């Protein structure tokens, strides 16, 4: 790994000659230059300590001699016992335990037993001898220690979710072995706090508490390692570097000749006025110690050499893996942690007070009744009087609660339990709400916190009289009901470690009236699956499992910001038995609609966002720099009532910009139409009848009087579009460019013409179509135009086709078709399926624009539907497929040349577009539903769409699909398109009908896929349009201000396909 230089050498050298004030700052702001540089000198195993891949605890990949033993299920932490082979418990005095546990050859091997003994020991000993006072590298200034051992923190938003998880892992590591508590900062409680950020110093932090409010702890490039963060937190807690102790020369040799020039000051010794003097020896294994080659001229030259280390000793000088034994004891002494107790971070465990497990005869005692055991003098001799004040800290993740089962308690009774007691608080410190204070004889109590932490303070001054204390069991549960009165966080179970298998958590959050619940994910990493069938987070607008689904999320992509429409939110987290990931961390916030309750000052539109609002503009305008007023932009409303004119793409004749969106509406006088003729056209892409314009494109609509947009066409490439005209008096153009290729754009001239069809239908019996300077009449299906050009007569060449497959051909095929005929074929298949038409032979009189003889195919029930293609000549068209369950085809010939016509086959395919209306409709999994099972290897997509102001509701009438545990074989998957990402409603299989589903938007997407094996009956689904819940947006509230003309068009064909688009609809 490549190291990073954190500060120029000259700058570092100047630090030693600065003013007295600068020296004072240097004393308390530690720059760990070595932490960034040393990474290039460490073995890969030390540099890349992968904390996530450990099976269960922090020590999973360490040397076996340093691995603490697993905690037994019945964890009795305060007093360890040995077991004889007979299985009986053997009594052992507390003093002898201390001696046995501390007779360890250097280096000291850290185990839970050692921690336990050191925490209990009243007089620490080594090899049976008291530890002498020696200098220890912790701050001597008591005001620099954090009050009550509570260190509030905030994390800069520049860090990723993985970084935030790593910071929390390091903080939990300190908490696990000390009484120090790292808590998320509450501005109302915590004036001083640390702030994880990035400074120019790279890896650096203040020594202890600064006392001036926000206190940075810099985790820069190459510093984001688990051990390095523990090291920097050590400085924050109050630790100097270990090698800066005054007695260090008795334990190490500083090889000054090997130190980089200008970096010698990093090895200076601190004065006695700067360090405390606890009762601990020099610690070569401290995480606060430099490595042997820190600031070395060369990786092969040592700057630090230990003294008197026996050959073969495993020494980890400068290790950045974990706290050493000495680090832990030193921190507990510095913060005056209780002589007994510990921190629990697991999901369940047992807590037993000192003395409880022994009676006078050395056998585990289960006292009964209310008798007083103080009369047993033999018991008194076994008790250590120093173990009368203990503190246990149970720490869960945000969104979890702690349940304590108090199995037995035996303490001296007193009024209000003022003498001896067990005090339980809902939180992390003495100011947290008091839940219970208990004394006397109690059993069977159950106590639950409302937060994710529980604090137990235990006082038993009369233990020597036989009051044995208590025994309890705790468990951590996730989910529950939350009353949201201020911002708070929820995390997946065990976060920031991997969540556990087979876990299900449900949170029901309720905000005050006139508020909404907002959710913002800060970290997200779940097992990935297309249908989120394995591990997922499901969010609903309400407080129960059948409330409106907002989204189901999995994978590692951060979900969008989410806000409910009501004042309640339902969050469900599920994990399966296989893959576990980091999980998630999210912030819950109260939110109000600022557009309703504040003077927003937006000139045009106000758009509510998460915790704020944004202003937007109407079509043809752009938001100015002040964020409130709007100005003219590309596009706009063009008044064509007085003269003709031209439209140009942005920047023409230069190339148009990237990421541009423009909307024009050309408005003609009443009873007039707009005609548009292109003289130049050059956009990215190639527009053929079998391709789509996916990059840059121009869409043209005819805007109807009721605001419906009827699509005329979408165009890209370099071929000139045909002359187009509006059906009524408004023509709408929408231009879009992406972020890549740019072209020269387009020029189009518009002219205004009287719409002859607007008066008395132009005299046409059936239909009138306006043309430039004139008009044309046409007839409905089954009729042909009479010689007078206005009236219609019935034709006999018409075919209504309702079968699911077949063959068709033109009249007289393979001979020449007749002259002057008008034939049509109307295909109609089962709802939810569509017709695919394939030509096998095709020969129709040729013309560049097919104005003589032609075959025209329409996507719907008549010629008024969208055109799929108009064909002539001798080339077989590509296969044509409708988007709905109807297709209309016309063969029209004139009095001139004749050809043999065509032969084609048609087949009904699943999928397509479905228009949801106020009336319930039903579609099926396959055309022959009810008589035959569905086919193998099917792949079907349906798009069910309602009007823009409505939602889609689907209900399953029958459901029978091959079952598999993951729905991997045959399945129906239901999603909907969102502004930033798709929402997954679920993947279904088996024989149980899925629940009713109501979309958040106006569209639902259904995908039915089957494999090559078993086939069952299939499904039947009814669908209809319904009113959505009260107005609000349930997806991404950090969206940027919409582009001018953000009233993005929606379109479908005549099969109930023209969509109403009122000006208030935001797409």
UniProtKB/Swiss-Prot annotation:
The Gene Ontology biological process terms listed for this entry are:
amnioserosa formation; dorsal/ventral pattern formation; imaginal disc-derived wing vein morphogenesis; maternal specification of dorsal/ventral axis, oocyte, soma encoded; positive regulation of activin receptor signaling pathway; positive regulation of BMP signaling pathway; protein processing; proteolysis
Q: Which GO terms describe its molecular function?
A: calcium ion binding; collagen binding; metalloendopeptidase activity; zinc ion binding
Motif Cell attachment site positions after renumbering to this chain: 245-247, 325-327
The note describing how and how many cofactors are bound reads:
Binds 1 zinc ion per subunit.
Show the propeptide residue ranges: 37-136
**What are the UniProt keywords, alphabetically?**
Calcium, Cleavage on pair of basic residues, Developmental protein, Disulfide bond, EGF-like domain, Glycoprotein, Hydrolase, Metal-binding, Metalloprotease, Protease, Repeat, Signal, Zinc, Zymogen
Q: Which InterPro entries match?
A: BMP_1/tolloid-like, CUB_dom, EGF-like_Ca-bd_dom, EGF-like_dom, EGF-type_Asp/Asn_hydroxyl_site, EGF_Ca-bd_CS, MetalloPept_cat_dom_sf, NOTCH1_EGF-like
Residue numbers binding Zn(2+): 231, 235, 241
Is Signal there in the keyword field?
yes
Any further remark recorded for this protein: Mutations in TLD lead to a partial transformation of dorsal ectoderm into ventral ectoderm.
Entry protein name? Dorsal-ventral patterning protein tolloid
Source organism of this protein record = Drosophila melanogaster
């Amino acid at each position: 790994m490549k190291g990073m230089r954190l500060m120029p050498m000259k700058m570092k050298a100047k630090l030693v000659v600065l003013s007295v004030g600068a020296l004072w700052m240097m004393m308390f702001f530690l720059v760990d230059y070595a932490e960034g540089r040393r990474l290039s000198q460490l073995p890969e195993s030390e540099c890349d300590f992968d904390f996530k891949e450990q099976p269960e605890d922090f020590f999973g990949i360490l040397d076996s001699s340093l691995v603490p033993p697993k905690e037994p299920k019945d964890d009795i932490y305060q007093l360890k016992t040995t077991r004889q082979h007979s299985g009986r418990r053997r009594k052992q005095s507390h003093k002898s335990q201390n001696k046995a546990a501390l007779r360890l050859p250097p280096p000291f091997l850290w185990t839970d037993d050692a921690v336990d003994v050191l925490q209990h020991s009243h007089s620490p000993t080594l090899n049976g001898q008291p530890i002498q006072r020696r200098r220890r590298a912790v701050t001597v200034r008591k005001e620099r220690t954090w009050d009550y051992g509570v260190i509030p923190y905030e994390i800069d938003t520049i860090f990723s979710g993985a970084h935030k998880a790593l910071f929390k892992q390091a903080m939990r590591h300190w908490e696990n072995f000390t009484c120090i508590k790292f808590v998320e900062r509450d501005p109302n409680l915590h004036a001083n706090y640390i702030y994880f950020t990035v400074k120019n110093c790279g890896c650096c932090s203040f020594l202890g508490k600064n006392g001036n409010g926000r206190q940075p702890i810099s985790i820069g490039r190459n510093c984001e390692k688990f051990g390095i963060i523990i090291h920097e937190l050590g400085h924050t807690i109050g630790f100097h570097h270990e090698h800066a102790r005054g007695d260090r020369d008795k334990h190490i040799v500083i090889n000054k000749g090997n130190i980089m020039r200008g970096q010698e000051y990093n090895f200076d010794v601190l004065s006695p006025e700067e360090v405390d003097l606890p009762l601990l020896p020099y610690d070569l294994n401290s995480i606060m110690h430099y490595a042997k080659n820190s600031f070395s001229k060369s990786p092969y030259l040592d700057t630090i050499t230990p003294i008197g280390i026996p050959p073969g000793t495993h020494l980890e000088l400068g290790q950045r893996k974990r706290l050493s034994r000495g680090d832990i004891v030193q921190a507990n002494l510095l913060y005056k942690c209780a002589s007994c107790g510990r921190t629990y971070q697991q999901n369940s465990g047992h807590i037993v007070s000192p003395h409880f497990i022994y009676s006078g005869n050395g056998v585990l005692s289960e006292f009964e009744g209310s008798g007083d055991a103080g009369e047993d003098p033999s018991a008194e001799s076994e008790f250590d009087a120093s173990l009368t004040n203990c503190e246990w800290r149970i720490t869960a993740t945000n969104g979890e609660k702690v349940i304590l089962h108090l199995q037995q308690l035996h303490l001296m009774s007193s009024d209000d339990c003022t003498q001896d007691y067990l005090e339980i608080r809902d939180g992390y410190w003495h100011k947290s709400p008091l839940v219970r204070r208990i004394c006397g004889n109690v059993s069977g109590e159950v106590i639950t916190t409302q937060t994710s932490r529980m604090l137990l303070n235990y006082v038993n001054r009369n233990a020597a009289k036989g009051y044995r204390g208590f025994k309890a069991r705790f468990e951590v549960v996730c989910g529950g009901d939350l009353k949201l009165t201020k911002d708070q966080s929820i995390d997946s179970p065990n976060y920031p470690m991997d969540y556990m298998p087979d876990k299900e958590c449900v949170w029901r959050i309720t905000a005050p009236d006139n508020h909404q619940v907002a959710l913002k994910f800060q970290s997200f990493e779940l097992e990935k699956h297309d249908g989120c069938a394995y591990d997922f987070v499901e969010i609903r607008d309400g407080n129960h499992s059948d409330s409106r689904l907002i989204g189901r999320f999995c994978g590692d992509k951060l979900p969008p910001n989410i806000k409910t429409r009501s004042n309640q939110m339902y969050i469900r987290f599920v994990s399966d038995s296989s893959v576990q990931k980091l999980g998630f961390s999210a912030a819950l916030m109260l939110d109000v609609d600022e557009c309703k309750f504040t003077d927003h000052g937006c000139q045009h539109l106000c758009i509510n966002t998460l915790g704020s609002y944004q202003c937007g503009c109407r079509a043809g305008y752009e938001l100015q720099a002040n964020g409130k007023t709007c100005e003219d932009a590309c596009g706009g409303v063009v008044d064509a009532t007085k003269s003709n004119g031209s439209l140009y793409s942005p920047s023409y004749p230069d190339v148009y910009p990237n990421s541009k969106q423009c909307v024009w509406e050309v408005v003609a006088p009443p009873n007039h139409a707009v005609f548009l003729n292109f003289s130049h056209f050059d956009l990215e892409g190639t527009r053929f009848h079998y391709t789509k314009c996916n990059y840059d494109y121009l869409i043209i609509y005819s805007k109807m009087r009721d605001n419906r947009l009827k699509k005329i066409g979408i165009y890209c490439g370099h071929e000139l579009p045909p002359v187009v005209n509006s059906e009524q008096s408004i023509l709408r153009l929408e231009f879009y460019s992406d972020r890549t290729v740019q072209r020269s754009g387009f020029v189009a001239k518009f002219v205004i013409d009287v719409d002859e069809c607007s008066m008395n239908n132009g005299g046409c019996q059936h239909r009138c179509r306006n043309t430039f300077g004139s008009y044309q009449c046409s007839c409905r299906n089954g009729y042909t135009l009479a010689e007078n050009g206005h009236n219609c007569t019935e034709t006999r060449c018409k075919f209504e086709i309702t079968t699911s497959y077949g063959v068709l051909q033109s009249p007289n095929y393979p001979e020449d078709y007749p002259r002057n005929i008008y034939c049509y074929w109307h295909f109609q298949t089962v709802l939810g399926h569509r017709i695919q038409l394939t030509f096998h032979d095709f020969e129709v009189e040729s013309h560049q624009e097919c104005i003589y003889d032609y075959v025209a195919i329409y996507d719907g029930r008549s010629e008024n539907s969208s055109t799929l293609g108009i064909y002539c000549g001798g080339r077989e068209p590509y296969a044509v497929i409708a988007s709905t369950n109807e297709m209309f085809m016309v063969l029209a010939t004139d009095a001139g040349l004749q050809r043999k016509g065509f032969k084609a086959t048609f087949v009904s395919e699943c999928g397509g577009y479905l228009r949801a209306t106020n009336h319930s409709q039903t579609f099926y999994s396959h055309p022959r539903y009810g008589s035959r099972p569905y086919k193998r290897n099917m792949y079907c997509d349906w798009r069910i769409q309602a009007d823009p102001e409505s939602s889609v509701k689907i209900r399953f009438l029958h459901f029978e699909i091959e079952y598999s545990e993951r729905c991997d074989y045959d399945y129906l998957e239901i999603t909907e398109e969102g502004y930033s990402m798709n929402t997954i409603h679920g993947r279904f299989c088996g024989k149980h009908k899925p629940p009713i589903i109501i979309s958040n938007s106006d569209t639902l997407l259904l995908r039915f896929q089957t494999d090559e094996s078993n086939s069952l009956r299939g499904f039947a689904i009814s669908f209809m349009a319904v009113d959505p819940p009260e107005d609000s947006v349930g997806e991404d509230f950090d969206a940027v201000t919409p582009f001018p003309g953000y009233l993005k068009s929606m379109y479908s064909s005549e099969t109930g396909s023209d969509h109403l688009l009122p000006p208030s609809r935001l797409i």
